[in-house]
C-alpha cells in the first residue's frame, strides 16, 4: 500500500542528472609528441588505421554489431572532419560529432557526395557549436546515453588540448596512444600527457595499463611503431587491492563455520566518492551489477523470499535458501528460499514478529528507512540517522545473520554520505558487491530527500580472504584498476520501492574479465 511507501520528491531527477559524458582519447604521435602540421598526418601506418577503426567501432558485447540503437561516438574538430576523404565520411558504424562554430548538421550532410549517402547517414552526423565540453554535455543527455556505449575524442590539436584540461580531463578514462618512429619530424602540432604533480596534470596521475612490443609496419618503409594504453590512477580501487594484498601477506589464519578457513585482519576502512554520478563498481574484476541492483531493491521492499531473486536470474541466495541449509539452521518450518527476518525485513519492520515470507507486515515494527528519509528532510544535521539489520532476538530465525549490519547517514553542503559497518567481510566475493550495493542505497536515499550523493565510507570488522580465494585474488592484484563507471536513471518512480533494475543503467563500465571464486557456504 502507498501509505507505507516512501514518496519521491518532484525534484527526484535533479540530483543525479549526468552533466558531462566520460570519454577516451585516441592519438598517434611521433617520438616527440608530434601529431601533424594541422593539415595532414605525416606518416602512413595502415596497422594504426586498422587499430583506430577497430577500437572506435567495436562494442563490448560479444558479437554485437553497431547500430543506431547502440554504437560508439567519435568527437572531432572541423579540420579533422575535413581531413577525412569525402568518400569515407562519415566514419561508418559510429556517431560522428563534429565541432564547428559555423557549420550545422545539415551543412555537414550536404557535403556528402550524393543524396543516397545523405539519407543513409542522416542519423550518423551531429554538429556541435562549441568545444569538447559542449559535445560531452550533449552526449550526456538522455537522447544519447542509452545509444552511445563509448565516446572517443579523435582530434585535432585544439580538441586534444581541451581534453587534457578541466573539466574534460576529469572525465577522461583512457588514452590510446600509438607512437610512430618517424624518420624525421615535420610536425607543428603536438600532444603530450602532462607530468604528474604539475599544474597542467590537474591532479591526475596517468599510469600505463598496457604497452605492445615494437612492431614493424608493412607500409613498404618498415616504419617502427608501438601501442600503449594510459589510464588515470584509481586510488579508490587501490584501497581495496592494497587491503586484499595486506590480508594475504599479513593476515591471521582463522577457522570459520564454512570449514574453508581464512586469512583475516580486524579493522579497516575505505572511502569512495559518489559525486557526479560516479559509481564505485570495481574494475579489476567484473562485478555482477544486475545482481547488486536487484538485491538492493529487494532489501528496500522488505522482501525475504529469495525465489523472487532467482526467478530474475540472480542466484546469490540460492545456497543459503536451500532446503538442506535451512534445515541445518533448524528452520524446518520455512518454505524453501524463505530466508526469515533478514536484511530487508529489519530495515522496514524492525521488531515485528516474523512468520513467513508472504505475510502482510504493513505498519508492523519500525520502518528504519522511512524514518531516516523523514529525518533527512526535516533535520539533516541529526546524529541519529542510522539503521541496523542486527536484531539479536531475531538472529536464530534468520537463514544467515547479517554481515553488513549498520549504516549511518551524514549531510554536508547538500551532499548525503553514508558510513557502512560490516562485521564479516569476504574480500574476494562479498565486499565488491557490498561497496556497489551501499553506493546505490546512498544514491537512492539522496534522490528521495532532494540531496546529492556525497561519499561512501566502508568500515570493515573481520576482513578476510578465504583460503580458496588466495590464488584468484593474487591474479586480480596484477591488474591496474581502471576508471569507475557512472550511473544514470532512465526512468523515475513515484515511490522509492517501485524502482526496478531497468530504470537505471551503468555506463562507461569497462572492467577486466571475471575471475572465478567459489562461494563458501
Curated annotation (Swiss-Prot):
Binding site for dUMP: 257, 404, 422-426, 434, 464-466
Annotated binding of substrate, by residue: 26, 48, 154, 160, 178
Catalytic activity field: (6S)-5,6,7,8-tetrahydrofolate + NADP(+) = 7,8-dihydrofolate + NADPH + H(+); dUMP + (6R)-5,10-methylene-5,6,7,8-tetrahydrofolate = 7,8-dihydrofolate + dTMP
Transmembrane annotation, as ranges: none
Cited SUPFAM superfamilies: Dihydrofolate reductase-like, Thymidylate synthase/dCMP hydroxymethylase
Biological process (GO), any one: one-carbon metabolic process
UniProt record similarity statement: In the N-terminal section; belongs to the dihydrofolate reductase family.
Entries under PANTHER family matching the protein: THYMIDYLATE SYNTHASE (PTHR11548:SF2), THYMIDYLATE SYNTHASE 1 (PTHR11548)
Record's protein name: Bifunctional dihydrofolate reductase-thymidylate synthase
Organism from which the protein derives: Trypanosoma cruzi
Upper taxonomic lineage: Eukaryota, Discoba, Euglenozoa, Kinetoplastea, Metakinetoplastina
Amino acid at each position: 500500500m502507498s501509505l507505507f511507501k516512501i514518496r519521491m520528491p518532484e525534484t527526484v531527477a535533479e540530483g543525479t542528472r549526468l552533466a558531462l559524458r566520460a570519454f577516451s582519447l585516441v592519438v598517434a604521435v611521433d617520438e616527440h609528441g608530434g601529431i601533424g602540421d594541422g593539415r595532414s598526418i605525416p606518416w602512413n601506418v595502415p596497422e594504426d588505421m586498422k587499430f583506430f577503426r577497430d577500437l572506435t567501432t567495436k562494442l563490448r558485447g560479444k558479437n554485437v554489431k553497431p547500430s543506431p540503437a547502440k554504437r560508439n561516438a567519435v568527437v572531432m574538430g572541423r579540420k579533422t572532419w575535413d581531413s577525412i576523404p569525402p568518400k569515407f565520411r562519415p566514419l561508418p558504424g559510429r556517431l560522428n560529432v563534429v565541432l564547428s562554430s559555423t557549420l550545422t548538421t545539415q551543412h555537414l550532410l550536404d557535403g556528402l557526395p550524393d543524396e543516397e549517402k545523405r539519407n543513409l547517414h542522416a542519423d550518423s552526423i551531429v554538429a556541435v557549436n562549441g568545444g569538447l565540453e559542449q559535445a560531452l554535455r550533449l552526449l550526456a543527455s538522455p537522447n544519447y546515453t542509452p545509444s552511445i556505449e563509448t565516446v572517443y575524442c579523435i582530434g585535432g590539436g585544439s580538441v586534444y588540448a581541451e581534453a587534457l584540461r578541466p573539466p574534460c580531463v576529469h572525465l577522461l578514462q583512457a588514452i590510446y596512444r600509438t607512437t610512430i618512429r618517424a624518420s624525421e619530424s615535420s610536425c607543428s602540432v603536438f600532444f603530450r600527457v602532462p607530468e604528474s604533480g604539475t599544474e597542467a596534470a590537474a591532479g591526475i596521475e596517468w599510469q600505463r595499463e598496457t604497452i605492445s612490443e615494437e612492431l614493424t609496419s608493412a607500409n613498404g618503409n618498415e616504419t617502427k611503431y608501438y601501442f600503449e594504453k594510459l589510464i588515470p590512477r584509481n586510488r579508490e580501487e587501490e584501497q581495496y587491492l592494497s587491503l586484499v594484498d595486506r590480508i594475504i601477506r599479513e593476515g591471521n589464519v582463522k577457522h570459520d563455520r564454512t570449514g574453508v578457513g581464512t586469512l583475516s585482519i580486524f579493522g579497516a576502512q575505505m572511502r569512495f566518492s559518489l559525486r557526479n554520478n560516479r559509481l564505485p563498481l570495481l574494475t579489476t574484476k567484473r562485478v555482477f551489477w544486475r545482481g547488486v541492483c536487484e538485491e538492493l531493491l529487494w532489501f528496500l521492499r522488505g522482501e525475504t523470499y529469495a525465489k523472487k531473486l532467482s526467478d530474475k536470474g540472480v542466484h546469490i541466495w540460492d545456497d543459503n535458501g536451500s532446503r538442506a541449509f535451512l534445515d541445518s539452521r533448524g528452520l524446518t518450518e520455512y518454505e524453501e528460499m524463505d530466508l526469515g527476518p533478514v536484511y530487508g525485513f529489519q530495515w522496514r519492520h524492525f521488531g515485528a514478529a516474523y512468520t513467513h515470507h508472504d505475510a502482510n507486515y504493513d505498519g508492523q515494527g519500525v520502518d528504519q528507512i522511512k524514518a531516516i528519509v523523514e529525518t533527512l528532510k526535516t533535520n539533516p544535521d541529526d546524529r541519529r540517522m542510522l539503521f541496523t539489520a542486527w536484531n539479536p532476538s531475531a538472529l536464530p530465525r534468520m537463514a544467515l545473520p547479517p554481515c553488513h549490519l549498520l549504516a549511518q547517514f551524514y549531510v554536508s553542503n547538500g551532499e548525503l554520505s553514508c558510513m557502512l559497518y560490516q562485521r564479516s567481510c569476504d574480500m574476494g566475493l562479498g565486499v565488491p558487491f557490498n561497496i556497489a550495493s551501499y553506493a546505490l542505497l546512498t544514491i537512492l536515499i539522496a534522490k528521495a530527500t532532494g540531496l546529492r550523493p556525497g561519499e561512501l565510507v566502508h568500515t570493515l570488522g573481520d576482513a578476510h580472504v578465504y583460503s580458496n580465494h588466495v590464488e584468484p585474488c593474487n591474479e586480480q592484484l596484477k591488474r591496474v584498476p581502471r576508471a569507475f563507471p557512472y550511473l544514470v536513471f532512465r526512468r523515475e518512480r513515484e515511490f522509492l520501492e517501485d524502482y526496478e533494475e531497468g530504470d537505471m543503467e551503468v555506463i562507461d563500465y569497462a572492467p577486466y574479465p571475471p575471475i572465478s571464486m567459489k562461494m563458501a557456504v
